[in-house]
């Protein structure tokens, strides 16, 4: 069938979407324990987009970046998404990596790993959220998401061990696409 994601901040909208059978909830800012339990029961993924919330919260400190009426809401969204994420992860909601493309500048999406870890997710689980869990969510885990015989050889190699320090994931050594190393200058 069709894959469906819902952009939702409020609990009632999330609840209705999860009951209707969506595959994932994006943002989930004001997710309640009731919604978390429904997501667990239905196998619904949570894509928290913490980096988008943090970016908006940071920009709320700049005069005239947002209309004055929006600034208080923008200031609270980052900490709220982080808090919701921590609760959802601890409760057992399935997590997939996502950053809400277009909110923050291109190339800064790797910060999502740092925010996830700072909110209580172990480094290896943050990495899995961006690999095998996202592949499962998108129903392409037979092709991508893990290193296995028969799967596409799409890899990112980093300098340093991201299991020791998740920030090392930003130190990209090379990228491999379909088994071919992609040179930075190509």
Pin down the residues of each PLM region.
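His/Asp/Glu-enriched, well-ordered alpha-helical/loop segment
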Residues: 3, 68-69, 76-162
């Amino acid at each position: 069938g069709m894959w469906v994601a819902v952009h939702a901040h409020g609990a009632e909208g999330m609840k209705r979407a999860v009951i209707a059978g969506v595959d994932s909830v994006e943002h989930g800012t004001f997710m309640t324990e009731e919604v978390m339990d429904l997501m667990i029961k239905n196998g619904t993924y949570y894509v928290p987009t913490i980096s988008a919330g943090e970016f908006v919260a940071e920009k709320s400190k700049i005069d005239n970046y947002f209309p004055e009426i929006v600034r208080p809401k923008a200031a609270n969204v980052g900490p709220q998404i982080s808090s919701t994420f921590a609760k959802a992860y601890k409760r057992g909601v399935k997590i997939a990596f996502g950053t809400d493309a277009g909110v923050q500048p291109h190339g800064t999406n790797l910060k999502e790993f740092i925010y996830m870890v700072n909110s209580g997710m172990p480094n290896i689980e943050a990495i899995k959220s961006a690999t095998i869990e996202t592949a499962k969510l998108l129903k392409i885990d037979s092709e991508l998401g893990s290193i296995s015989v028969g799967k596409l050889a799409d890899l990112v190699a980093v300098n340093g061990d991201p299991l020791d320090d998740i920030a090392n994931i930003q130190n990209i050594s090379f990228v491999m696409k379909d088994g071919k190393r992609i040179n930075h200058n190509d």
